[in-house]
A protein has these predicted regions:
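Generic, low-specificity signal for short hydrophobic/alpha-helical stretches with a mild N-terminal bias
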Residues: 5, 102, 133-134, 149, ...
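Propeptide-to-catalytic entry region of secreted or membrane-anchored zinc metalloproteases
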Residues: 1-104
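Sparse, context-dependent recognition of short Cys/His-centered cofactor- or disulfide-binding micro-motifs
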Residues: 16, 77, 105, 131, ...
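Catalytic glutamate of the conserved HExxH
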Residues: 146-154
Length: 202
């Protein structure tokens, strides 16, 4: 089970280590982290002031497989680009921009299982967005939950009806905060059947 966390440096770098450590604990697998580069804002819609998450995931797949005819190194920092030579494992990008997809006004994150790529944005996960007092622990908790949720999709898991499960689909921040940082027994069994994760969890 190979998972790479691409942490765009426009998102506070100090959060990348605790997020990767908590993701690793939730998934019970090591997370490889790169956090010193900037990923292009693919699919930016000036009217909405958001990025199309589907286009971003497609670009991410092109980037990680290094297809020079489609993704030029000059699109981003060359040293950052060179650190991702032929990565074929599953990838989670953390980007600073607000995201949408064609059928939704916004998304906290999105996964593209066929490509093995996923993206999460902390844009609407911070307390400040809702006029609340800043709290890094809240933000870390939400990024981890949403990140683990999208990684679950990359391994073929569907949405779960258990409101406490990682795979429950949150409609808003309240739903996300209500979730726990674990997979329910059913989802855990499904995940373990697709990966090397142990089935015993709860």
């Amino acid at each position: 089970m190979g998972i790479h966390l691409f942490w765009d440096s426009r998102v506070p770098i100090g959060l990348s280590k605790p997020v990767s450590e908590e993701l690793s604990a939730v998934l019970e697998t090591p997370i490889s982290r790169i956090d010193n580069g900037i990923f292009p804002l693919e699919g930016f819609d000036a009217v909405r002031n958001q990025c199309d998450a589907v286009k971003m995931l497609t670009k991410l797949d092109i980037f990680r497989t290094r297809r020079p005819d489609l993704f030029k190194p000059e699109d981003m920092d060359a040293q950052f680009f060179d650190r991702f030579s032929h990565i074929h494992e599953k990838v989670l990008l953390v980007t600073p921009v607000d995201l949408f997809e064609p059928l939704a006004d916004f998304v906290f994150g999105l996964a593209y299982p066929k490509l093995g790529t996923a993206v999460v944005s902390p844009y609407r996960l911070s307390n400040e967005y809702y006029g609340r007092h800043p709290d890094d622990s809240d933000l870390i908790d939400r990024i981890v939950k949403e990140g683990a949720h999208e990684i679950g999709h990359l391994y073929g898991l569907k949405h779960c009806s258990n409101e406490s499960c990682i795979m429950y689909c949150p409609r808003n921040l309240y739903d996300l905060d209500r979730k726990k940082k674990y997979f329910c027994g059913k989802c855990r069994l499904q995940l373990s059947s697709r990966t090397e994760l142990p089935s015993a969890y709860e």
